[in-house]
Amino acid sequence: MKKTIGLAYRFFYLNNNCDFYLLFLAPFSLFNLGVMVASAVISVVYNNQPQLIWFTNFDTFTYQSNTIAAVCVLMYLCKRRCKLFDNNALFLSAAGYLVFTVIFFNLYVLSRVTGFVNVEEHVKGWFSTITSEMPYSFSGNPLTDWISFAQLFLHVIYPASFFGFIWIFFKTYKMREPLHELGKFLLKAGVYPSLYAFYLQTVPFLKIWDNGHDSYSVYGFFSQTKYNSYVWFWSIPIFASMFLILWGLFVINNRYYGAKTKYGKQ
């Protein structure tokens, strides 16, 4: 009974704009997770490859950063007094991961539109994030249109809605426990990107779909560390840019949202 009352209180006793926005973003986050699961299942069925539920789908930074953001929103809805939300570090980290996703995928889209990067037909059906079709293009084919919708949703629509929540959240509550130590924040926030970078660089050596000339890599040619020695020239700067983004968000957060407000600590 107490849990039921608490749930009703959560949904109907709205304190501020942040709470109102949360009512929209929470189901939107569930839909976000549904889009990823549906895309992975479609990939499995279309290619008759059960392992694609992970490979090319949930092992991409796009899926993982969107999952982290959605889970953070749902956790905050259910357990906003959790110690993880005593300061803004968790939301700031999730926002950083999504910023990275948005920037680099849309740079890839721009490179495709301008013709700077061309992807061969043979990658179709193997890489959900790098396909032979032009990103965000709708042709009337249900399969390719779903891929385009999922790309648009995961790289533009949901990140924009999450960034809107972050802005309202920071503006409403500001710093309940200010983040003074940049190094400590980067160390904690950088754990996940570091682990992911390790996975990205090592998975081509695991002999997954390895024919002696090519093997599975999450982003095809761009992350093929086994058969493409030039990968290291751009992978190191890209990895460093993740920390640059986190640093920028830390500075912006402390600069504009550092003072406590009348809302105080929840």
From Swiss-Prot:
Pfam short name (any one): DUF1600
Membrane topology, from the record: Multi-pass membrane protein
Protein's cellular compartments: Cell membrane
Principal localisation: membrane
One GO cellular component term: plasma membrane
Domain of life: Bacteria
Transmembrane segments: 22-42, 90-110, 150-170, 185-205, 232-252
Protein keywords: Cell membrane, Membrane, Transmembrane, Transmembrane helix
Protein name: Uncharacterized protein MG133 homolog
Organism, as annotated: Mycoplasma pneumoniae (strain ATCC 29342 / M129 / Subtype 1)
Lineage: Bacteria, Bacillati, Mycoplasmatota, Mycoplasmoidales, Mycoplasmoidaceae
